[in-house]
A protein has these predicted regions:
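Short acidic active-site motifs
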Residues: 62, 88-94, 123
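Short, well-ordered secondary-structure micro-motifs
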Residues: 14-15, 30, 55-60, 90-92, ...
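Short beta->alpha junction loops
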Residues: 79-87
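Gly/Ser-rich helix-loop-strand patches that form or flank binding pockets
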Residues: 1-10, 97-139
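Short beta-strands and strand-loop turn motifs
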Residues: 3-4, 45-50, 79, 106-109
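Redox- and metal-dependent alpha/beta enzyme cores, enriched for Fe-S-associated oxidoreductases
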Residues: 23-73, 80
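Intrinsically disordered or low-complexity boundary/linker segments at protein termini
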Residues: 1-41, 45, 130-139
């Protein structure tokens, strides 16, 4: 799903992209889907949002491998990590995109029960309702 804000458009493709990264099928799918919207040689930042110690296990993150693959395709790639609490991960990712000057924010979309979303927060919901820039969500 590509969500465009009234004041933002992607005419000609995205030049600066922030991809929310986690070792999940949804995040990987979203990252691959975003390449269809990226301009040749676009700047891409892979951002991991760390909200608990288990999220930061060294050696278990594939974003470096994906960054290498993107580099080989001619993209200018960087990786970063942001710390967040469980209830502000979406806002943290939006902040990373704004700091990077991104014209597209990409993330995997997760579907959970309403109770689950209420208890831990809904990153997907935050991205849909709070992002001032275009968002690509893939599931």
């Amino acid at each position: 799903v590509l969500v465009l804000t009234p004041e933002a458009a992607l005419e000609g493709g995205a030049e600066r992209i922030v991809m929310g990264w986690s070792d999940t099928r949804e995040a990987t799918r979203a990252a691959h889907d975003a390449l269809a919207l990226a301009r040749s040689g676009a700047e891409i930042q892979l951002v991991s949002v760390i909200s608990r110690a288990a999220d930061a296990v060294p050696g278990l993150d594939s974003k470096d491998d994906f960054a290498t693959a993107l580099d080989r395709l001619g993209y200018k790639v960087s990786v970063s990590e942001r710390n967040a609490t469980a209830d502000n991960r979406g806002e943290t990712l939006i902040g990373a995109a704004q700091d990077f000057g991104a014209d597209l924010l990409v993330a995997g979309a997760f579907g959970h029960s309403q109770l689950y979303d209420f208890v831990i927060g809904a990153v997907t919901r935050d991205l849909l309702y709070k992002s001032p820039l275009p968002v690509l969500l893939s599931k």
